[in-house]
Amino acid sequence: MELAAYLEQLEGGVFKLLPLWEDQDNGQDVHLDLYIQDLLDEMIGAQETFPSLAGNGHYIKVVNTVQYMAKHECSRSAWKRRVFGMMSTLNRMRGYCRDV
């Protein structure tokens, strides 16, 4: 898999955090904690598939943000801000891949 394709797929996975959080906030059992853990496992594993990610500050920031969200409660506005911030970062990273 090409790095740009992975980052695009990951951006979609990060976006999915929004409806899952909203469904959970509305009382549905969506297993958000399991989804976040699976997402983190994938992101950490990707650092072996794409070694350049391991030293990329933007990528590490996204991983750290997901880890924070896994352990701490957030307001709706904070959750949305974090998700859209991560999506923006991943989108910029994809742009860098195309420019190379």
Feature roles, as predicted:
Residues 1, 36, 96-100:
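Short intrinsically disordered terminal tails
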Residues 1-33, 87-92:
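Short terminal alpha-helical segments
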Residues 16-65:
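Amphipathic alpha-helical interaction modules
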